[in-house]
Each structure stands twice: as structure tokens, then as C-alpha cells.
From Swiss-Prot:
PROSITE patterns assigned to the protein according to its UniProt record, in alphabetical order: COMPLEX1_49K (PS00535)
HAMAP family linked to this entry: NDH1_NuoD
Gene Ontology terms, MF aspect: NAD binding; NADH:ubiquinone reductase (non-electrogenic) activity; quinone binding
Any GO CC annotation of this UniProt entry: plasma membrane
Lineage start: Bacteria, Pseudomonadati, Pseudomonadota, Betaproteobacteria, Burkholderiales
Gene behind this protein: nuoD
InterPro entries membership: NADH_Q_OxRdtase_suD, NADH_UbQ_OxRdtase_49kDa_CS, NDH1_su_D/H, NiFe-Hase_large
Membrane topology annotation: Peripheral membrane protein
Name of the protein in its database record: NADH-quinone oxidoreductase subunit D
Location in or out of the cell: Cell inner membrane
NCBIfam families: NuoD (TIGR01962), PRK06075.1 (NF004739)
Organism of origin: Acidovorax sp. (strain JS42)
Amino acid sequence: MAEIKNYSLNFGPQHPAAHGVLRLVLELDGEVVQRADPHIGLLHRATEKLAEHKTYIQSLPYMDRLDYVSMMCNEQAYCLAIEKMLGIEVPLRAKYIRTMFGEITRLLNHLMWLGSHGNDCGSSTILIYTFREREDLFDMYEAVSGARMHAAYFRPGGVYRDLPDSMAQYKVSKIKNAKAIEELNRNRQGSLLDFIDDFTQRFPKCVDEYETLLTDNRIWKQRTVGIGVVPAERALNLGMTGPMLRGSGIAWDLRKKQPYDAYDRVDFDVPVGVTGDSYDRYLVRVQEMRESNRIIKQCVDWLRANPGPVITDNHKIAPPSREAMKSNMEELIHHFKLFTEGFRVPAGEAYAAVEHPKGEFGIYMVSDGANKPYRLKIRAPGFAHLATLDEMARGHMLADAVAIIGTMDIVFGEIDR
């Protein structure tokens, strides 16, 4: 009888579990994965090259579109790199606002990850639950920037504007009656800080709901326990960061080890796993959501008690306020020059990294003294994680490959750049 050879299977890029445009060429022995070869580049948009032909401010909106699930964290790294090269000091209130929105972004990312990962493994209920909370978080984005996703809110030297004193209200429509609208507007009567404070009080119960659905669910455990195990030393050697590294038991978190913005002023714990499997990474991310909620609450309390400026007073970098621009011709000219010609950055280089929801997101920037970068290099955490897929999936079943892709939390905007 002829020997049955391995066969190849093309997975994606249209597959719903591919999380974007991943194409995997899988070599299978029956249903067991022998080799996994990820093909990337289908979402390549030349962001690094585009940045060389734009001023520093004009490149900022491109950052939102890298990891398009963790928008403000990308902006944060970019602004930190520019501030490091300019040597400017960011007002403390702006640091707290950045820290707060960095954690709001972490919640946005982890909720998206939890919903889609649960859905990949067969629990479609969790997807609906997590998207319910994401709506409130998007409303926070919209309140400060006018955009629900690609905010472009952070600026070199601070943030675009201070937090608003009121929240937008829902109006009665054909879809929702007056009673439903009144319930939706119940927690929108005060300022944005009041709205965020209300969310932080409600959110722990929501996380409890997610854990009720999954943590002790025997099907969820069968799909994640012992799947994609990465020992601690191997995780370090493979360049893993963020929850992927902490899931293997290494307490490495840039917010603690190399604090930026206001992270050295807030109190939080770094959750770590034990075995380094998909289940541990799930537990780490769920606990991270609870810790992020703690940080947001501390930021809200501080911001309420401490008014102040939210952007540097260096007018070569910071644009004038919208109010001044509309009433004063000099301010209008200042605004126009800043957004068309930009500002010049002294020759040199800088690397700034943030504890992005997916891992260490870094920006390496080289300046030749012009108004645009000579070179911009983006260190995407998902790139290193996707490279480990072959090692993590080998010997597992085809269905487990989907769970492993899910546990990595990959987004192709940052991987392909």
C-alpha cells in the first residue's frame, strides 16, 4: 500500500479566524500540524516610508492606523520619541490624561481580543458582551477627539485639548423610544470624568460576567489548557513581550520597569502566568483589565483635583487654541505654518517604547535637523509573536492552530506596516 504523505492546506487570508489578512500555509499529517508558514505583507502600506515625506505632526494620524485596535498607544510611543529628541517637558495633567487614555485603549484592545478569541473557540456569547462595554469606551474617545477610533488626540508636548465638561446625549429616534434614550443618557449628565468614573464602578462586574462564561467552562479549558505552551526562557529568546511574555511567568512590564508619562505615580500590579499556555495568557489579560480599571480610577481622581495646562507652552511645537485662532490673525498664521511646515527637530536619534496592549511597541526615530524624520522604524510586538507560530502550533491539531492565532492577539496593521 502506498505511503500517505503530508498535505498542504492554505488557511486564510479570507478566513474569519485569520484576524485580518493572515495567510498560513499549513503542512498537515492528518489533522496534526507539522509546519506552519505565515505569509505576511497583504496589508503593507509603507507607513515608515510615508513618514519620511511628512512633517512630524502630519505623520501622527498614520500611527492610529498601525494597530487599529489600540490607537492611542501607538500615538503615545510616537509622541514620546519626538519629545525625547526635542527635550521638552510635558505638563503633569497631560501625562495623567495620556496614562488614562492609554489604559482605556488597553481595555478596548483586550475586550476586542477576548470577544474574538472566545468566538474563534466556539463561544459567540462573549463577543456580544465585550462589544457592549467597547461602546462606552468609544464614547470616551469621541468626547475628546470627535472620532470613535482614529483619534489623533495625543500631540508632541501633551494632548490636543482638555477633557470636556459635558457628554453628548442620545436623542429619541425611530429605533429607540424615550424610555430607552433616558436610560442611555442616565450616566451622561455630567462631565467626561463623571462618565469615566461611572464606567470604572460598573466594569468589574462586567469582567466577572466574562469570567463566569469562560474561566471554569470545561470546553474553554479543553481548547486552551496545554495549547501553545512557551516556557519562560524560550519566550525571552523568541522576543516575546507583553501578555505573551507575562503568561510564561516573567513579570516584565515597561510601565513598571521603564515608567513613562504618569505610570510612576499610579499603583497597580503586574499579573503573570505559570505554565505559559493559552489559558494562562487568557487569565493574564483578564486580570490586566482589572488593573487597567484601577489605574483609570486613580487618574480620574487626580484629574478632578488638579486643573492645569494640557500641552507644552513651547509655541514652536504647540499650536494655538481653536478659540484664539478664530479671533486673531497672528494665531491663524501660527497654526497654518505649524501644520504645513511643521517644526524642526535637532539632529540625532531616539527610541521610545510603551507597554502596548500587545507588548513592547517601539518607535526608533532618526532626525537630520529637518522638519520631517530622516528614518522612522516601528517595532511592532505582533511581528515577533507571529514569527513564533510555527513553533507553537507544531504537533497540535488544526483546530488548535486557530486558538493559538487567537491567543497571540495579532493585528496586521502593525505587522505589515
